[in-house]
Amino acid sequence: MRRPILALALVVALVTVALFVNTLAQGQGLPKSVTIGTNPAGTVYFALASGIAKVVSGGAGYQMVVQPHAGTSTMLPLINTGEMEFGIQNGVDLWLAYRGPAHQIGGRNPFAHTPNVRLVMRGAPLMVGLLVRKDSPIKTVHDVKGKRFTGEYRAHLAGWYNMFGHLSSAGLTWNDVKVVPVNTVNDGVDALLQNRADVTQHALNSAKVKEADAAVGVRHISDDCSPQGEERMKKAVPGYYPRIVKPGAITGVVEDTCVVAYDTYLFAGKAVPDQVVEAALKAVWEGGEQLVPIHPMFKEWTQDRAVDADASIPYHPGAVRFYKERNVWKPGMDQVQQKLLAVNP
């Protein structure tokens, strides 16, 4: 008789604890769950969002659920209107969306105006490299002229800016290549695998690149990292900067390779309550050691990168309060914040 009684007592105790935690969370104004939007499965951002969601769910007092989307253009409107709370995306896309269609890069800004996005934490830089088949004669970006080159990226517009930045580093334009239209970065890799394209791109160490390497063998090729190439890249896409990556730990990198890098943002909607943002930020802030094993990019997702004077969108008030309490909101950041808020008064 004692075992059933003990089992029943254990169940009652667990239910009581769960109810207590839920009541405590509700008392703090926290929801039962929130969503975090990101790119499709197989992308680096999906892996990052999954890691963030795991840590937040374990430490914020509520569950965070990952909601993948085709790309920035489909995800941002949901956060802007409050249908989704959080997102993982790059600072360049957010710069364009926050400022609206009048602000363009390469003559383009197809993002819907998204004035209600707010930065929670600047994370690690995303590194994106041009990708070819392993047996391709193409060695660097200077060899892509006249080649079949994935473009358009109708559902994943960051891909268009990536490719524009790669080309610009070499002083090339879209007119110098044969554009193969694709919808997403994953579709671009599929075009390479199906021999419909000679050159595509993807984030370094993504699941999709690993899949392609296992299927046919692929390698990343270098952009132009000379001082002139760097200047052309930065002028073409503000927020981009070159990175040299070495062979060894990254799939498809067989020699020192120059790639595009740009910052990743954990962000939220303007209407998300301060305490919800602070709870998520606290969990990520204190959970860095849990993040590192999930994906190599989390090695650079550090506390000292969180507050950035070159941020492309304003910080969420909950994040500002969090950083001020920890004395990491540096002198001059209030002026940066006011300048960014003034873009959409």
Whereabouts are the PLM-identified features?
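Short, low-complexity disordered leader/linker segments with a strong preference
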Residues: 1-31, 345
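Ligand-binding clefts/hinges and TM-proximal coupling segments of bilobed small-molecule sensing domains
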Residues: 145-165, 239-300, 305
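Bilobed "Venus flytrap"/periplasmic-binding protein-like clamshell domains
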Residues: 31-65, 126-194, 308-318, 322
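An extracytoplasmic/periplasmic, membrane-proximal ligand-sensing/linker region
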Residues: 204, 208-225, 232-234, 275-279, ...
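N-terminal secretory/targeting leader peptides
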Residues: 34-37, 41-45, 53-74, 81-84, ...
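Pocket-lining segment of extracytoplasmic ligand-binding domains
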Residues: 91-93, 100-102, 106-109, 136, ...
